[in-house]
Amino acid sequence: RISGYLQDVFKFRTKQGLFTLVGGVRGSYWSYNREFIFSPRASIGFIPNFDQNLTFRLASGLYYQSPFYKELRTTVQDEHGNSIIQLNKNLKSQRSIHVIAGGDYTFRASGRNFKVSADMYYKKLDNLNPYTVDNVKIRYYGENCAQGHAMGLDVKFFGEFVPGTDSWI
């Protein structure tokens, strides 16, 4: 397996505020399943001049998750009707296309720093390898036969609630 990553950051200021652009790409090749993946991603951040405690963000990109050993396992029938386990060399990485919009607000209270972060996200998923659960046993299908999506809102409150200790809620 071979992989590489390249990223650059570009900052510029306008009369409205500070912009930060981040662009990157990850590439990898896995000889086991002969898969080459190319994952571009980009984000933009903005800190407005009217309130330096605010930050707005927008990001998007492709994310791939290579299969683990347990995911490669698939059940097939031999010529006698017996079920046997073998590894699927055609199984590809699961893929997600992410879009995220969010922001932060930092402030001081009681002499300590605090930050509220909120992010809305949408992820389109494909090449999924589903699984079944039987009590504590997880059995993967061993095939890229599903797709899905995830969306939501993450809100975090960070601060020094106990002096000297950073915490997240």
Predicted regions and their residues:
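Transmembrane beta-strands of outer-membrane beta-barrel pores
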Residues: I2, V25-S31, S60-S66, T75, ...
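Transmembrane beta-barrel architecture of outer-membrane proteins
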Residues: R1-Y5, I37-R41, T55, S96-I100, ...
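Surface-exposed extracellular loop regions of Gram-negative outer-membrane beta-barrel proteins
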Residues: R1-Y32, I37-G45, F157-W168
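Outer-membrane beta-barrel translocator/channel fold
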Residues: N49-V99, Y105-T106
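Outer-membrane beta-barrel channels and translocator barrels
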Residues: F12-G17, I47-D51, S96, F107-G111, ...
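Membrane-embedded beta-barrel scaffold of Gram-negative outer-membrane proteins
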Residues: N90-M151, D166-S167
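Transmembrane beta-barrel strands of outer-membrane/channel proteins
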Residues: G23-G27, I44, L58-L62, E71, ...
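Outer-membrane beta-barrel translocator domains and adjoining extracellular loop/strand segments
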Residues: N33-S39, Y69-T75, N82-I84, L128-V136
